[in-house]
A protein has these predicted regions:
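Short, membrane-interfacial amphipathic segments enriched in basic
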Residues: 1-2, 76
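Charged, glycine-interspersed solvent-exposed loop segments at helix/strand-loop junctions
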Residues: 172-270, 421-501, 505-506, 511-516, ...
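Acidic/polar loop patches that form or flank catalytic/metal-binding clefts of enzymes
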Residues: 278-285, 346, 402-403, 432-436, ...
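Short glycine/threonine-rich loop-to-helix capping motif typified by GTGT followed
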Residues: 359-364, 497-500, 542-545
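Intrinsic disorder and flexible/low-complexity segments
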Residues: 300-303, 307-343, 461, 532-589
Length: 589
């Protein structure tokens, strides 16, 4: 028996020691990666900025230590790092050109692509060259790579060029199968966010607005490619209608979509020739990560660039399956208050990429931006979306800049409550009774539908919220509420259409927004600083262990286009009942 207990004790001690050693090695690995990531890159003369167009492009990408520890490599591209890196490459005499290598590339929006493309066009003004190569070009990757001086395709490659489509998913019939109905109160003919739960197809109003903004985005894409490749817009549309994705590679060259069919090693020879180096010598390559480690000059006064992207929520929301990054009103308001009090910050650029969310949370952020505006200039730079709640928090700014392909507007709100009575009684066999002290004491119970009187109260509440929203827009844009009503009703616009109706002041990217902020603050010399400041590796490690963001990202990658319907259902019980959000997150393919 003694030997038995000794063996058990030895086994337990061995397991504990092994676990302790693994934890120590894990922490040392994290520390090593943190230190190595902070080292400044040394750029050699006659270098090339090499950009791998694969994975997702989002506003910002934080170093993911959980992904690194799992042995995976993140291919995600930060738009912030892309624009900054290309600008640094333009101004660095040691970097002679850019090499783009296209793969499975999925941007979060065409507005992000447009901003990245404009950065490449600006790079070319320096007289430096861009060479692009791809085994396969997704439509977004081709739009971006079309700026290249020379564009090559693998002899067995493909170009995906087919136009744009938006395909919302409708959940009414699926919910009905489990006895669930959605009760809705909304304001706005075009406020179609609830249609996914109450209908089985797009309304005429939503179909009209979706058609309008898809055509607007596509016109910008074809115009850009037409100018770069010297192919008419009409011809590009013919190519899309012909589904040239399945054309023979040599056809792409005949159609002038590419300059040649080459293998990777042959493209490297082209790059070496441009660098004027011998074929046997290696190319000095620099990555966006390398350039991220090179600090910009911090001469002059500071302009803060604050990134707010994701769903707008109030307080801590569940970290798992939460539609990715969140705009937490409590956190954002505190950050904005800090920027307001920071005497070193002379102006603030708010980079907003959001389809909205909680109407209450949007109002809190709106108030804090109004307070900030009293102290220093505020300029909004819109990303892929700044719609509904995203526009709500943009409205008070001194100046609003949007990309032509930004989706914005959607001025309207809705309330949505599930009726689970059918699920409980018909599917699960549950029965409910109630005792109450007052007439409406049981209001909000999901065990039965609302009474007509209860629904009338809710509708009045929604109407009041809609009037508040319009009032905020009217104040910020210096319009009458009648003028706002004419362009509201939940209507979604592209940035270029929003400019025509004065919802935005200027078309362009974040660089224009920064320049405008400097002008409003009367700054001749200035530098920018990005906020929120990325958390240190240990905080990030703890957050990822507690909030399960790592699992969220893995599920997003696994489910692909099915991730959104999954989260729509998952979030029904967690999201605020009163919402100011875009009709749906368009899966633009």
């Amino acid at each position: 028996m003694k030997d038995f207990f000794k063996n058990v004790l030895a086994t337990i001690v061995g397991i504990v020691l092994t676990g302790f050693i693994l934890v120590i090695f894990g922490l040392l690995s994290i520390i090593g990666m943190a230190i190595s990531s902070e080292k400044s890159a040394s750029i050699k003369n006659n270098s090339v900025l090499s950009i791998n167009l694969s994975g997702q492009m989002t506003e910002r990408v934080e170093d993911d230590f959980m992904t690194q520890l799992s042995g995976q490599v993140s291919n995600n591209i930060s738009l912030e790092d892309f624009i900054s890196g290309v600008r640094k490459a333009k101004n660095n005499d040691k970097i002679k050109g850019i090499y783009l290598e296209a793969g499975a590339f999925a941007p979060d929006s065409y507005a992000s692509l447009q901003a990245a493309r404009n950065a490449l066009l600006d790079f070319k003004k320096s007289g430096k060259w861009i060479v692009a190569y791809g085994d396969i070009y997704t439509q977004g990757a081709y739009y971006l790579a079309s700026v290249a001086d020379k564009l090559y395709l693998n002899p067995q490659g493909q170009i995906d060029w087919h136009g744009l489509a938006a395909q919302p998913v409708f959940l009414k019939d699926m919910l009905a199968k489990v006895g669930v109905k959605m009760q809705v109160a909304k304001v706005g003919t075009y406020k179609s966010a609830t249609e996914q739960f109450t209908g089985d197809k797009m309304s005429d109003a939503d179909r009209a607005q979706t058609t309008a903004y898809l055509n607007g985005i596509w016109q910008n894409i074809t115009k850009g490619v037409s100018e770069s490749r010297k192919i008419s817009v009409a011809t590009l549309n013919q190519y899309a209608d012909s589904l040239i994705t399945f054309a023979a590679p040599n056809e792409y060259q005949k159609l002038k979509l590419v300059d040649g069919l080459l293998y990777t090693d042959q493209v490297k020879k082209v790059v070496k020739k441009l660098l004027n180096i011998e074929e046997k010598k290696r190319i000095n390559q620099v990555s966006l990560t390398d350039l991220k480690g090179i600090d910009d000059e911090d001469d002059g006064e500071e302009i803060a660039v604050y990134y707010a992207y994701g769903n707008i929520v109030d307080g801590n929301a569940p970290g798992m399956f939460s539609q990715g990054h969140l705009i937490d009103a409590q956190v954002v308001c505190k950050d904005i208050e800090d920027l307001m009090k920071d005497k070193d910050v002379k102006a603030v650029v708010l980079r907003i990429n959001s389809g909205g969310g909680s109407a209450y949370a949007s109002e809190q952020i709106w108030h804090q931006i109004v307070e900030l505006k009293k102290v220093k200039p505020v300029v909004v730079s819109m990303g892929g979306m700044a719609a509904s709640g995203g526009y709500y928090i943009s409205a008070p700014a001194n100046w609003i800049v949007a990309e032509p392909t930004t989706l914005t507007g959607s001025i309207g709100i809705f309330g949505m409550f599930p009726d689970l009575g059918g699920l409980y009684s018909e599917k699960l066999g549950l029965k409910f009774d109630e005792v109450k002290t007052n007439k409406n004491a049981a209001f909000g119970s999901m065990t039965r539908p609302f009474t007509p009187e209860e629904m009338s109260y809710l509708e009045r509440y929604i109407d009041r919220g809609y009037k508040t929203f319009k009032n905020r827009v009217a104040q910020g844009r210096k319009m009458s509420e009648a003028q706002v009503e004419n362009i509201a009703q939940g209507h979604v616009y592209t940035g270029q259409d929003a400019f025509k109706i004065k919802l935005v002041d200027e078309l362009g990217g974040i660089e224009k927004a920064i320049a405008k902020a400097a002008k409003l603050a009367n700054l001749k010399e200035y530098h920018t600083a990005s906020y929120p400041v990325p958390v240190d590796w240990m905080t990030q490690f703890v957050n990822q262990m507690t909030q399960k963001n790592y699992l969220d990202e893995q599920l997003r990658a696994t489910l692909g286009i099915y991730y959104e319907p999954f989260t729509l259902i998952k979030d029904l019980n967690n999201q605020a009942a009163i919402q100011a959000r875009i009709p749906y997150y368009p899966n633009i393919k």
